[in-house]
Amino acid sequence: MIATHIKRHNAPKGLFSGNMNDAEISLQNEKIYQMIFLKRNLNKFIEKGDLNQSIIAQHFGTSQSQISQLLNSKIDSYTMETLTVFAFMVDSKLGLISSRDEAKQKMLNNKLALMKEISLKIKEKLKADKINQSELGRKYFNTNQSVVSEFVNEVNFKVHVSNYSYDRLRKYAYVCGITEKELDEYEK
């Protein structure tokens, strides 16, 4: 079983029924669940003697002190994106899998897929409410029209994907009302 993401993204049902404040709370909760998943599985392999913090740090491409913080539930300095990339490199039965490059590529693919989902919801909302991109950006994302236009123009997703952290995309998904089931579809 490949670890991807402990699914606790409980977006409100309905198109654009969420807000950025609740999205931030949801994201912080998701980080905790992701940390629990990583901590539980990494500690299991450490206790068996299969891994140590140094090996994990080397595999994850980070410092041993960062791994120590993770294993001690200190995740303030971690983003959801980093925790999820780490989770892509852990299998609950096999231990460490996937290289950091493979995990980062999987994250990039997930971010592009999530941008497409958000794009569909934005287009649907623009049409349904007959509002312009600036209004939608201000009202729902606390941002400007240029951000919304980047989601409307799918041709440039590969150009713009680097502008968006996974954390930010998860918050936008929450606001858009993208459900856990929809997120599961692209996170496979």
Predicted features, each with a name:
Residues M80-G95, N163-E182:
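DNA major-groove recognition helix of helix-turn-helix/homeodomain DNA-binding modules
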Residues Q53, Q64-S65, Q69, L94, ...:
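The DNA-contacting recognition helix of HTH DNA-binding domains
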Residues K44, Q58, Q69, L120, ...:
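DNA-binding alpha-helical recognition surfaces that contact promoter or target DNA
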Residues D50-N52, Y78, I131-N132, D167:
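Residue-level signal for the short linker/turn that defines the boundary of a DNA-recognition helix
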Residues D50, G61, D91, K130, ...:
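Central "turn" residue of the DNA-binding helix-turn-helix
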Residues M20-G49, I97, A103-E135, K139:
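A short, Lys/Arg-rich alpha-helix, primarily the initiator
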Residues F60-D76, N142-Y164, Y186:
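Recognition helix of helix-turn-helix/homeodomain-like DNA-binding domains
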Residues A57, A87, L126, G137-R138, ...:
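The alpha-helix within a helix-turn-helix
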